[in-house]
Amino acid sequence: MEVSSRSSEPLDPVWLLVAFGRGGVKLEVLLLFLLPFTLGELRGGLGKHGHTVHREPAVNRLCADSKRWSGLPVSAQRPFPMGHCPAPSQLPSAKPINLTDESMFPIGTYLLYECLPGYIKRQFSITCKQDSTWTSAEDKCIRKQCKTPSDPENGLVHVHTGIQFGSRINYTCNQGYRLIGSSSAVCVITDQSVDWDTEAPICEWIPCEIPPGIPNGDFFSSTREDFHYGMVVTYRCNTDARGKALFNLVGEPSLYCTSNDGEIGVWSGPPPQCIELNKCTPPPYVENAVMLSENRSLFSLRDIVEFRCHPGFIMKGASSVHCQSLNKWEPELPSCFKGVICRLPQEMSGFQKGLGMKKEYYYGENVTLECEDGYTLEGSSQSQCQSDGSWNPLLAKCVSRSISGLIVGIFIGIIVFILVIIVFIWMILKYKKRNTTDEKYKEVGIHLNYKEDSCVRLQSLLTSQENSSTTSPARNSLTQEVS
């Protein structure tokens, strides 16, 4: 009996027992043959050079009538030979000490690694295990730490994930200060150690420009040169030698330095004005309105200013105000708000309702119209509300397609009817014209052939000629003879 296998894997004793049993081999020979396998199992499966031999898990296989074993061995499904590990993947924090181009390693092989710069210097190894995988290299290399950063003056440092190699920190300044320098730093390799790639920034006051001066007045503060975030200045109007007021201070008397972007300082508002007594500055701006009165820098007592709202807006309050003492306008200024000008029809059959249409629209607003399925839009799909309450262009209509088809059918029917009448009239006129021509020919024949002694004969001949469909030569000769 011959036992063969295309695989290089060792034969299992169970397979051999079945094979030799079927071949009629004596029991003594069979036991002698199986003895090496049994001893090998007792020795723990040690192979040559002290490497551990890897055995595949048992698989059910049968010897079929074709004298072949059913089922493929597990090693046939491996991308590498049994008892080996594939080359390990590249480690992110370490490199191999001895470089090799081997693509696989026997079980029990160990490889030496050393940690990369930026990590605490050390060596370690990974080993090919019995299951053809490598021991873990995780946490073998520990990242070095940069020195603990300190808060900048008038600022803060923000540590998010730590201060180890590769970490990033951020700096911010307190309110009223701006950052000079880099707002972040990264722990990087420097020579044989690690350190932050940039120095800590500086936080300085946000500066403001000198406050603007005003006619007939001045500002007062703790300094006249350096102004920074949070400082306050106060304005006053000039007085006479006795301290009597000559002007009225109009506006906010105090301004403070602030910032909109955290970089550049600005004053909180415009400076006040010092105006003559019993005068008024122009009234404040009224949104969506125009001032009809003459625009002047100053108004006298009891001067009147009138307002008018823009088209499409409705005024609330008095349309005119009067200048009063201490730069006050009375009554209260009016306001202009959008008025409901245009409305959609209550009956909107055939229109789509999901387009955000409203029942009422303000001046200048647009409405978009679309028809539902089965309807046709007649007119523009968009209309705008006008100041007089009308729509421009006029609102479109949604007409049912069945009605449109009926209208088209009626129109075509009318055209066909007119054409039929025209053809009928044409045929009648043509027929009358032909009859008129025949009568003329008959009259000419009578005049040519008229004779007193042959009236009866000629009349009979003409009647006979009309009733006949063809004219014979004999009849022509007879007519000539009579004439």
Curated annotation (Swiss-Prot):
InterPro entries: Compl-Cell_Adhes-Reg, Sushi/SCR/CCP_sf, Sushi_SCR_CCP_dom. Disruption phenotype: Death between 9.5 and 13.5 dpc from developmental arrest. Disulfide bonds join 85-128, 115-141, 146-187, 173-203, 208-257, 237-274, 280-323, 309-336, 342-385, 371-398. Belongs to the receptors of complement activation (RCA) family. Residues 1-40 form the signal peptide. Keywords: Complement pathway, Developmental protein, Disulfide bond, Glycoprotein, Immunity, Innate immunity, Membrane, Phosphoprotein, Pregnancy, Receptor, Repeat, Signal, Sushi, Transmembrane, Transmembrane helix. Ubiquitously expressed (at protein level). PANTHER family: COMPLEMENT COMPONENT-RELATED SUSHI DOMAIN-CONTAINING (PTHR19325), COMPLEMENT RECEPTOR TYPE 1 (PTHR19325:SF545). Its main location: membrane. SMART domains: CCP. Pfam families: Sushi. The lineage of its organism: Eukaryota, Metazoa, Chordata, Craniata, Vertebrata. CDD domains: CCP (cd00033). Residues 83-143, 144-205, 206-276, 278-338, 340-400 form the Sushi domain. One of its GO terms (cellular component) is external side of plasma membrane. Residues 427-483 are cytoplasmic. This is Complement component receptor 1-like protein. The keyword Transmembrane helix applies. The keyword Transmembrane applies. It comes from the Eukaryota. GO terms for biological process: cellular response to hypoxia; complement activation; complement activation, classical pathway; female pregnancy; in utero embryonic development; innate immune response; negative regulation of complement activation; regulation of complement activation. PROSITE patterns: SUSHI. Interacts with C3b. It is found in: Membrane. Glycans are attached at residues 98, 366. Residues 41-405 are extracellular. The modification Phosphothreonine is found at residue 463.
